[in-house]
Each structure stands twice: as C-alpha cells, then as structure tokens.
Regions:
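Compositionally biased regions
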Residues: 21-22, 105, 150, 209, ...
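Outer-membrane beta-barrel pore domains
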Residues: 43, 48-51, 70, 98, ...
C-alpha cells in the first residue's frame, strides 16, 4: 500500500512541476494557473482514555491548482491524500462560468453548502472539532448558482448535489442547499438552510448559523447547527451542535486559541404507532452524523506559530483538549457512562506555492 502511495506522490509531484513551468513561462493569458501548490501536515498525538496511545503520523497531503481560461471560466482542483490510510480523495474538481459580474454558475465535485465557520475550514486547518464535523461527509457532485453583490460583501448560493448520505450516486437522492456569506461590519456570516435526502423521500433539514466576529487581533466564532425532520415534535433544539472559538493574534507570528463545543441528539430511533389500540414502536428516520441518544462535549486550548516573519508557509501548532462522548447503552436510549478522553498534540504544516 505504501508503494502505491509513494508512486502516486511521485507522479503527482512530476505533474505539478511540469505545470508550474507552464505557469511561469505562459504568455497567453487566455489560460492561467493562478495557484499551484502542495501542502502537508504531520502531527504527534497522545491520547489518554480507557487506554493510552501515542504516535507520529502524517495527517494530510494536498495538491491544489486553480486558475482561469477564456476570460469567463475558472477552475479549481484539490486532491487530498489521507496519510492515515484511507486513500486519496477529491475535494474540489469544479468549473465555473462567470456569466456576469453578479452571477456565476459552478459544477463538479464540491463541498456541500452548509453554514458554519468550523465546517468552512479546510481539513488541514482543523485541530480538534465537533462530532458533526468529524462525521459529516461534506464533498459531493452537483451544481450551484451564485449571486455576488456589487460591493463584494455578500454571496448567495443555491446548490443541488447528490445526497451525501448514499454511496449509490445513481439512487435519485439529492441535497438542496441555500447559503448566505455576508460581511456586515464586524460580523461575517455563513448562514444556510439545507434539505438532504437520507432515504427516498425522507429529508433531514439543517438550519446552520455561522458567525465570525472580527475585533482586529481577536476573532470570535460562534456556530449553531440545528438538525431534524419536520415530523419530529422537537424539531428545534432536539438535535443540534453549538461550537465556539476565540483566537487572539499577539502578532503575525503567534496566535492563541480556545475552542469548545457541544453536540446533542435527544431524538429516538423509534416512534410510537398505534395498531389495534396498542402503541408499538416503529423505526423512524434519524440523524446519521450525531445519532439518537448521543451527547458529545469537547474543549481545548492551543496555539499557532509562524517561525518566519511575513511568511505563512510553515506553521507550528499545538493543543491540549478533552472530549466526553456519552452514547446510549441500548436501542431504548438508556444513558451510558461517559467516555472521557484527553488529547495532547504538536504538529507542523508546510506549504509550497509553485505559482501565485
């Protein structure tokens, strides 16, 4: 398996070196390579729970290329190789047509348009996260129409993709997403409403509110994601995630951060149905990211450091965090004891830009 990964890396590097030469020497502006980069991340992890484990591992190795052609078209490709053994994944392979200064159309493999700033980050920039972030399969094939305001402070996107909850991409199941990215004074928004088909004709619905407050050296992020089916009695606050993060940049070389969150789903796997005067439990649709009966709490402190002044291509990071996962002991959702885990992490991220 490692030989296959090595061959892929060598072939990809050769291809990227060839493309970088094209980017440097190109004279025709009808086709441009505006970004051509590779990036990787290696971490040391120590985890202490019921057992203790530690080790050094490569987290991610990414290739990214984007640019434009024929004046009205742009493209983006990002290939992510998971160095922990789950293979290669295409995050982005999109083509955009910029029909007007206010309107564009994009199609291809893309992230589902779900609100929230934790969700919006590339995986290589996330250190510890909510249960929803860890479990949601966020990339799929689809198309979207985008509106851009004249002042470039607001983007509204309507997107249709394959349902990300089915492995069969020809099942006729879809996700419908509407998101607003806004810039209103100190506040940047990533608000969305989403309908995602989990079974034929059964949609889980999201209301996702991502808030990023910019106070100069300090950033405060608060995300709230509500999930549920409309036929559930407690559609609001029965199944949700709440995430908060504070970052303070002392200078351009050192940032401290504190982050925490809470995921909860108090819905049931079953609903009571009356048959011949008897109430009988019947299976019902449920959230696949934070399953019924689960409570998950996490919090931690960390830092980011850039050793080279004015250069963000090498980043050191570290954090200490805990998480507590409470799962139901059986299908009747009887509570189980907590599973408290502690995590200590140090790592380095590097980026090489062949074209800018």
């Amino acid at each position: 398996y490692m030989k296959k990964i090595t061959r892929k890396l060598l072939l990809a590097l050769c291809a990227f070196m060839f493309l970088s030469n094209m980017a440097i020497s190109q004279e025709q502006k009808s086709f441009t390579i505006d970004k051509l980069s590779v990036e990787g991340r290696v971490d040391f992890d120590y985890e202490h729970g019921k057992t203790s484990t530690s080790g050094i591992g490569g987290k991610f190795f990414n290739f990214e290329m984007k640019g434009s052609f024929l004046n009205d078209f742009s493209y983006r490709i990002r290939q992510r190789i998971d160095m922990q053994g789950s293979g290669s994944k295409t995050d982005f392979m999109i083509l955009s047509y910029h029909a007007h200064k206010n309107w564009s159309i994009t199609a291809g493999k893309m992230p589902l348009a779900v609100g929230g700033w934790e969700y919006d980050l590339p995986p290589i920039d996330v250190y510890f996260a909510s249960l929803f972030w860890n479990n949601f399969p966020c990339y799929d094939v689809g198309a979207q129409v985008e509106y851009h305001s004249n002042n470039k402070k607001h983007d509204i996107i309507f997107q249709v993709t394959n349902s990300t909850f089915t492995p069969d991409k020809f099942s006729g199941m879809y996700a419908y997403n509407l998101i607003w990215y806004g810039n209103v004074g100190l506040l940047k928004t990533a608000y969305s409403i989403n309908m995602m088909e989990q079974k034929k004709g059964e949609y889980i619905n999201y209301i996702s509110l991502g808030n990023d407050f910019d106070f100069g050296k300090m950033h405060l992020v608060v995300d709230f994601i509500n999930r549920g089916f409309f036929n559930q009695s407690d559609f609001l606050f029965g199944d949700f995630s709440l995430i908060g993060e504070v970052k303070y940049a002392f200078n351009d070389k050192f940032t401290l951060m504190a982050k925490g969150g809470y995921d909860r789903n108090k819905h049931s796997y079953f609903k009571e149905v009356e048959e011949n005067g008897i109430m009988i439990p019947q299976p019902q649709a449920y959230d696949m990211t934070v399953t019924p009966g689960v409570e998950y709490t996490f919090a931690g402190l960390g830092f980011e450091a850039y050793p080279y002044k004015g250069n963000k291509n090498v980043r050191l990071h570290g954090f200490f965090a805990f998480n507590d996962l409470k799962e139901p002991a059986d299908d009747m959702l009887n509570p189980n004891s907590s599973n408290l885990e502690l995590q200590f992490n140090l790592g380095v991220t590097w980026r090489i830009n062949f074209a800018k």
